[in-house]
């Protein structure tokens, strides 16, 4: 297939930051490197990397393009879905524009149907995720989906994926996971070494980086420097320690984190897809690689999996390791699985760990900032 290498017609109207994003990814494409876009942590990036492609997260956390998306999609739909579609439709996301393939997944009904419309203007491959993660039938299905994805990439880009290439990709991706985990585990320090806002900025921003070796090096150096400064006494004041769980956040949804920290708390950890859920577990580098990929990705504790034992397990681990004083469940409007699962999370946090829990529902607008501030301030004061 021919790769996309030219800038969109509306390039000149973009802000300088976004122009730089387009130019950076265009430089990559001029080297004839395929770009695979993704929205979800279930996408097995190692397979695309082994095919010689660069994998990048796509824009989906701003209300900038939601109005355009609502011309095609229902208004009462999850903002992440509308934002994803809107950025693709309007050519305002450099990473989507230059993607040669977008990989979706069946994590929710809204996404599944949205991908059908997205496929009208971009090649889209949807991976069929099982509803369970704890039985052999589900494992067999997901393994076959990973193999099917491999075969599609080989056909799409004309580059056979060898076992050696896949193993090397797994090793590299694991190194990235460990570097990210070492960085975000700085939140375990008490009192904190840095704010949750800064942690999120780095972890979320890492999903848009192309050069993994450079990213790993920068993360390791940043972690080393922060630990050294902490040992010398550079640290934040003691405040109530908050653990975030729930829907993916970043971009506009990071308003919740900022409000928590503006009203007397510190966000010390992220259990959600933006944080530990994606990186806490690595892929086994030995044995059958497709079995190893299957096991790693089915261990992601997403609310689309039922029953969702992995989320409870990771949440308990993080409550203890991060010495959390409270848990805040961030739910995007119209995200039914996370909204329904909030009762189970509330029971788990309160009964198992004996600490306060609160769920907040939000979207990508700023309209609810006042209401959120009031609720979050009251919760933190209670701690």
Question: Which residue stretches match the model-derived regions?
Answer:
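Glycine/threonine-rich flexible loop motifs
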Residues: 113, 335-341
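Peripheral docking tails and interdomain loops at the edges
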Residues: 3, 343-383
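Acidic/His-rich segments in extracytoplasmic proteins that coordinate ligands and/or metal ions
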Residues: 85-155
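Proline-aspartate-enriched helix->loop->beta-strand connector
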Residues: 319, 323-328
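An N-terminal, globular interaction/scaffold subdomain
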Residues: 35-89, 100, 107, 114
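A charged, amphipathic alpha-helical module
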Residues: 2-34, 147, 151-267, 271-279
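Redox- and metal-dependent alpha/beta enzyme cores, enriched for Fe-S-associated oxidoreductases
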Residues: 30, 41, 47-61, 68-69, ...
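Glycine-rich, highly charged phosphate/nucleotide-binding loops
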Residues: 75-92, 303-317
């Amino acid at each position: 297939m021919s790769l996309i290498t030219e800038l969109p017609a509306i390039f000149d109207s973009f802000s300088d930051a976004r122009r730089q994003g387009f130019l950076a990814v265009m430089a990559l494409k001029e080297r004839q490197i395929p770009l695979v876009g993704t929205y979800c942590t279930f996408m097995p990036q190692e397979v695309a990397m082994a095919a010689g492609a660069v994998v990048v997260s796509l824009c989906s956390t701003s209300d900038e393009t939601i109005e355009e998306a609502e011309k095609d999609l229902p208004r009462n739909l999850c903002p992440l879905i509308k934002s994803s579609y809107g950025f693709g439709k309007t050519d305002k996301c450099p990473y989507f524009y230059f993607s040669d393939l977008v990989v979706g997944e069946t994590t929710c009904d809204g996404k599944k149907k949205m991908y059908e419309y997205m496929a009208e203007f971009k090649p889209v491959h949807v991976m069929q995720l099982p509803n369970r993660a704890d039985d052999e039938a589900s494992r067999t299905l997901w393994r076959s989906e990973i193999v099917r994805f491999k075969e599609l990439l080989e056909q799409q880009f004309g580059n056979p994926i060898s076992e050696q290439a896949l193993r090397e990709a797994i090793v590299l991706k694991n190194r990235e996971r460990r570097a990210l985990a070492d960085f975000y585990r700085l939140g375990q320090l008490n009192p904190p070494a840095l704010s949750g806002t800064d942690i999120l900025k780095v972890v979320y921003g890492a999903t848009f980086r192309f050069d993994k070796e450079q990213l790993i090096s920068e993360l390791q150096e940043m972690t080393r420097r922060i630990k050294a400064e902490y040992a010398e006494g550079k640290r934040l004041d003691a405040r109530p320690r908050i653990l975030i769980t729930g829907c993916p956040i970043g971009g506009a949804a990071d308003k919740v984190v900022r409000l928590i920290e503006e009203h007397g708390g510190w966000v010390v950890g992220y259990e959600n897809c933006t944080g530990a859920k994606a990186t806490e577990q690595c892929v086994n580098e030995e044995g059958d690689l497709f079995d190893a990929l299957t096991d790693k990705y089915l261990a992601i504790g997403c609310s689309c999996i039922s029953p969702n034992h992995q989320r409870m397990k990771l949440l308990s681990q993080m409550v203890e390791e991060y010495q959390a004083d409270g848990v805040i469940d961030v739910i995007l409007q119209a995200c039914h699985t996370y909204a329904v699962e909030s009762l189970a999370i509330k029971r788990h946090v309160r009964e198992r760990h004996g600490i306060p829990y609160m769920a907040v529902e939000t979207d990508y607008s700023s309209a609810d900032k006042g209401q959120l501030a009031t609720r979050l301030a009251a919760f933190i004061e209670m701690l």
